[in-house]
Amino acid sequence: DYNSGLESNANQEWKLVDAGNSTYYLACRPQHSSSDYYLAVNTSGTGLTKTSSKTSATAFGFIKASASEGGGGTEGGGGSTEETPGDHGSFDVSWISNQSKVSDHKEDAHATFIPYASVEQLKADALHYEQPWQQPDETKAEYINLNGTWKFKYVAGTSYGPGSSEFQAKDYNDSGWDDIRVPLSWEMANYGKPVYTNVGYPFSNNPPNANSGMSQYGVTDHNATGFYRRTINIPATWKDKRVFIHFDGVYSAAVVWVNGKYVGYSQSSNTDAEFDITGFVTTGDNQLSVRVYRWCDGSYLEGQDMWHLSGIHRDVYLVATPKVFVSDHYITSSLNNEATSGSMSVKLTVDNRNTVSTTKTLQVSLLDADDNQIATGTQTYSGTSTAEKTVTLSGLSNLRPWSAEDPYLYTVVVSQKDENGAEEMAFSTKYGFRNITKSGNLIYINKKRVYFKGVNTQDTHPEYGRAIDMETMMKDLTMMKKANVNTVRTSHYPRQPKMYAMMDALGFYVMDEADVECHYNQNLSSNSSWITAMDDRTKRMVLRDRNHPSVIFWSLGNECGGGSNFSTTYNTCKNLDSRFVHYEGAGSGTNYSDLGSNMYPTVSSVQGNRSGLNGKPYFICEYAHAMGQAVGNLKEYWDVIENSTGIIGGCIWDWVDQSVYDPARLVNGQKKSDKGFNYWVSGYDYNST
């Protein structure tokens, strides 16, 4: 009670009344009154009012804030986008040699989407709405593209840097730094030396440490570091929104600061890294700083047969959402065998990290390829914590199924409305209805047997290194279609999200492979201290890509041996999604692959396994080795496959030669030799010079 009745001016004293869930009503008792009044947010959400009814009152939560750091805007700086400034502690360099520390303050993985303020704005961005691999329109989407020119400083080692303790400060003078394109592998700008290896690591094999370069690959320095800086401008319209920075891929470890404050840490070079920077930015100009390590402990899981290059090699962008928002969506369907009728469910994750008491209306609409609405449904979220809500659309009929031959896509539109029915967020996802089943040792899609006629692929661009632009992706895929390729194995790591959108639309069957290969040190796959890292990479792949109809198989990695850690990653896949799981290293005595698989078998060996391998559908994950030469024996292999009762297909190694321009010449604009030929170098030739 009010000071046990001792307070003589009770109308100036407030009482906290427990409202549950760590929230409280604020009550006061006016003089000469025997009843309490409560604070309530007014119906427009713009101010406070009083009510004598507790049921009409607003429950308030409390957060810890620093008075010395907080709040309001100053001229040229704008106002903070969150109630309190961010405080994520500090980065510890020992993390790059700790296989159990895979990230810090990084967001959970989720399906790819770009938020808009309304369905109207979503559809007004017509090109991205129809072709999700296209660049979103920043005037319509809650999105800012950060690709382009950044300031850059390269240092051949981790122990020294350009003001390494203060380079991230907002007022640090980087005028003497170079400019660099983002995305780009920095070796292609002649910073350090590109390295091509098949089995061996480009650093001394001493896990989890990845510091000393290997002289046989021309790398004599210690672990290199790239320092990146750029200004980001937060529009005034984002003042009351939640702001995220998103990296599609960075080789191999990245530390992020905003306005001199540490935001977070990430490794796993080919999966998304997203950070909530709401409490770190203000409206107007802000300073983004990123330190990238060429190698880290995670590089032991990135020992693929490829060019080993470094830096921010995929897209970087900002997005803004409401403070409470749909952070993930998982689309599933229950269909008849032909995938022409059934139901669709969309599980929505409502993120309420600030435990605000609120109500949101969530709507899911299904539209055909002509943008005609087929069905719609809603769910209501009401609460103070993160929760999942599922919208199910039943009784769907006359569906046009998706396949590689007829890649028909529907559009799933998700929208969110506030307590007053005002729309505040919307996004869309392309979705195809299809059934994947197994009968005997054969795989069927929509009740039809499929021959998976595939290729392995790598991210290699002659000028940009591992940074593959949209035009190159589309050129590769359209050429594959012309060559009657219907399957892509993303050897040996997930691709950029936009490439899956292309494969959905063009019609490919995808074996989506986790970024896990420890070819030179296969003991890691049975060392339990590496489970966290292996499982994180696998989980992030599945959570990001499971809405894509093109993804038919998950693959746990490549050439890691048959270690028991794969039992964990197999179960992770199965717990998150129902697709079949592949792993070539799983022998006959293991239970962590739904397919029998091997690489480079002879035709006679394939003939001997024509009814299946290890009692499972047989997939030849690599064969007809084609690096630098023509493909041979295809007819002989396919005579056996097409007349088998248990072989489902395979993937040629590999789609395109992994050649790059010589960076030392490229930096001077020289792409051709003195005789006029393109001056491309292969990995083994380059390493020997």
Model-derived regions: residue spans:
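Lectin-like carbohydrate-binding module/patch detector with strong preference for beta-trefoil
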Residues: 1-73, 78-83
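Structural beta-strand segments of beta-rich domains
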Residues: 24, 241-243, 342-348
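Extended carbohydrate-recognition surfaces in non-catalytic/accessory domains of CAZymes
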Residues: 85-246, 303-304, 309-312, 689
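Extended substrate-binding grooves/exosites of carbohydrate-active enzymes
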Residues: 89-132, 136, 189, 300, ...
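Glycine/proline-rich low-complexity spacer/linker segments in large multi-domain proteins
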Residues: 93-115, 133-137, 263-264, 283-320, ...
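Accessory beta-strand-rich segments of carbohydrate-active enzymes
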Residues: 151-154, 218-328, 353-354, 508-509
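Extended acidic/polar, glycine-enriched regions
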Residues: 282-285, 349-437
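Surface beta-strand/loop "capping" patches
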Residues: 323-355
